[in-house]
């Protein structure tokens, strides 16, 4: 289906051409004065310069040609030369029925040429718990992935684990100090290693920070960790077996935590998976003359003549031969081109890493790791701050674990749901349902609270505001969906058959209903724009507008008590479409709605 605004533009453009003017002046936009009209065209103002006449003479001619067009209720020429447009309610009702018939798509066309897109998000380090700093990458990345999937593309989400380098040597060295008798440290051992890990996730989460602290104050410990890292990367059997245990224990816990966030990765690759590609990549860069030595390090120059600021070279290997994040990211691109051959790779990472990605992207292009046809995108996000405007911390100033934050919000929502239950005596929700509902609503509060902000901007994580059932919040959106579900349930309980409603939506009978239809009609344009700009906040803004439009219609209209049966069916059919579109949108944002609250 064509976007409503495009259909309107086509009609207005035809009128401009019929009146003797260039088609470029027929573009229509949403009205910036909704009190006067629904859409507007300012083309006559620009055309007046070319055709050397007063703009209102042009707008008068165009308006006269559109006077009898069935698409419009009215097209008014307003001095000095604007066209104010109102939609015909019958045309709008047909557009609604067409959207409803287009099951699961609602007028949004699928991509004609589906792309293969890799989304690199999450990026946790193994052996360390997820903290609040991991929230934005996970939440924004999951939504960007889901939006692209809804558009019809083949999308692969990769967690890109931090599982390489000194941190592994630190863990092995600390474990050796704690449990020196473990068979993994016996170099003469040739048998099979135990299948069960010699530590729990709790122990592992204590081992890493302890080891990290020691390495800063104890030089001999750091040297032992560096040696362990080298031996691990050199293939020492016992250390390889320990690495396998570290990965299994850590990834199991990470999956549990991401599951609680409703975040799912197609690939669980780590930096270690890219390491086999490093030697060949480095050799290629040397052979082809891309890489050269600078102050002992191997670098690739990536500055360009058009640069307005200094872009340092991309370091491939340090002076001691060690690789860096840039090395791993480039080798990961080599691996992805070989295994996935993506048309686009999207990275979700802190906006402060923008220089790193400029260097990596330029190096990848210059050295031919990726062809010109593959798009590389960095979505840089701002920080999540506390009410004091500083990065979000625990009450004692530490970094808050993500699961503790989610638990805090779950508890807050559970209290609100129980209070709501006391106020509504007929709402009998048992403890298990209340807890599940609280989790569902809390997740919406967290995700919507994040995603409703433009990704690049910092935002204040305000638990009180995010968990409110009023205003621009996740719980308000869910409350609206639950309200619609309740009306539909009552309709069916009285014998109504929702599945039999075909082309039932009739022309709007009041302003609230027309406003709801106009909001629904924006769905395809909104999702297309959110995809093109990788901007989930546009979907949040849309569903807030849609929820407000529905609630306005609900308060102005007797729905279930409507005596005219055809009109009641029209209302119910419109509610079904509203519910389905809201549900499709929140699914793209990565959360769902309960049946009642």
UniProtKB/Swiss-Prot annotation:
It catalyses: tRNA(Arg) + L-arginine + ATP = L-arginyl-tRNA(Arg) + AMP + diphosphate. PROSITE patterns: AA_TRNA_LIGASE_I. GO terms for biological process: arginyl-tRNA aminoacylation. Its EC number is 6.1.1.19. Keywords: Aminoacyl-tRNA synthetase, ATP-binding, Cytoplasm, Ligase, Nucleotide-binding, Protein biosynthesis. GO terms for molecular function: arginine-tRNA ligase activity; ATP binding. It comes from the Bacteria. Monomer. Belongs to the class-I aminoacyl-tRNA synthetase family. SMART domains: Arg_tRNA_synt_N, DALR_1. This is Arginine--tRNA ligase. SUPFAM superfamilies: Anticodon-binding domain of a subclass of class I aminoacyl-tRNA synthetases (SSF47323), Arginyl-tRNA synthetase (ArgRS), N-terminal 'additional' domain (SSF55190), Nucleotidylyl transferase (SSF52374). It holds the Pfam family tRNA-synt_1d. It is found in: Cytoplasm.
